[in-house]
């Protein structure tokens, strides 16, 4: 059975986006430690602008976590018995964290960036069992074309 929680590292989903990470690390630690104590076994982490992506560092803001810091935090979560699951919200109504790319929906460049980010996060999270991509608000007609590959 999955007993988990959605945690937000990044918050730039809507306007106006901030140029810094709006995140309280002490609260994060308190919540995740309590998750381990009460037997929660999964944390879905909405990353957004909270990570310096190796392929697209231009998406970072002041205070974004480095890949090394993220890996260390993932190791700590796993030691608490909490499986970290990444979430990259690509929904067209929650994508301000993508900066200029959020205005390039359905273009080849957009799909290249999305593929790069998914690859970065899959590697940093050590090939997670699940990967949340957002899009739960989207309909099949929202995006006019799909990637060629």
Which residues fall in each region the model found?
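Aromatic-lined carbohydrate-binding surfaces of glycoside hydrolases
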Residues: 6-149
């Amino acid at each position: 059975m999955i007993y988990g929680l959605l945690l937000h590292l990044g918050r730039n989903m809507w306007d106006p986006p901030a140029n810094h990470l709006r995140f309280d690390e002490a609260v994060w630690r308190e919540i995740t430690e309590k998750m381990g104590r009460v037997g929660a076994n999964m944390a879905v982490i909405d990353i957004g602008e909270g990570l310096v992506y190796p392929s697209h560092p231009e998406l970072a803001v002041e205070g974004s976590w480095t890949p090394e810091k993220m890996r260390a935090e993932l190791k700590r979560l796993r030691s608490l018995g909490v499986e970290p699951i990444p979430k990259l919200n690509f929904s067209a109504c929650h994508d301000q964290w993508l900066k200029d790319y959020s205005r390039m929906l359905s273009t080849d460049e957009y799909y290249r960036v999305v593929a790069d980010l998914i690859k970065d996060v899959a590697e940093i999270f050590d090939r997670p069992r699940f990967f949340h991509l957002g899009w739960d608000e989207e309909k099949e007609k929202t995006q006019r074309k799909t990637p060629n590959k």
